[in-house]
């Protein structure tokens, strides 16, 4: 089973776009209903793992976000990235991501939260870029309840999500270099083959 979706620019308005997403999520749910459940799987987040249904805020280096997408899709799960038009999918592939199991909605319109809420129905992981928006506690509670019910992990970036208890911050603290000359490390030469992240997290 594969899942790959994108914004359809031919849709006349946001309501039609949401209705199209709802139909696709309903179809996806029907396809996976007879398969093995991943509801017991944890989503790796660096040195920690997030249980299904967790809603958290992620800030800092995107390498952590991409590694989580890679882990979920490589394990046979489905993931979606909403409102992140400049996300580096090549980096995700290099980490092992299966793009056939990744939905990308670069432009979710004026209400990315609603788009993410629809995607929660058929995904194991949804990454939501708020684009600087603020989500109130009342609305956040409704989405959190839906994520818990469906067993979908929701990661929020680039905005203010009120009332969330799980927060992760990642920053690059070093690089792995592949030597260019006969395996001998030489300052200024070589290829960056990986990054080292410092990850700070808090939550209940």
Curated annotation (Swiss-Prot):
The chain crosses the membrane at residues 63-83. It is a single-pass membrane protein. GO terms for cellular component: membrane. One of its GO terms (biological process) is DNA repair. The keyword Transmembrane helix applies. It is found in: Membrane. Keywords: Membrane, Transmembrane, Transmembrane helix. This is Uncharacterized protein Rv3395c.
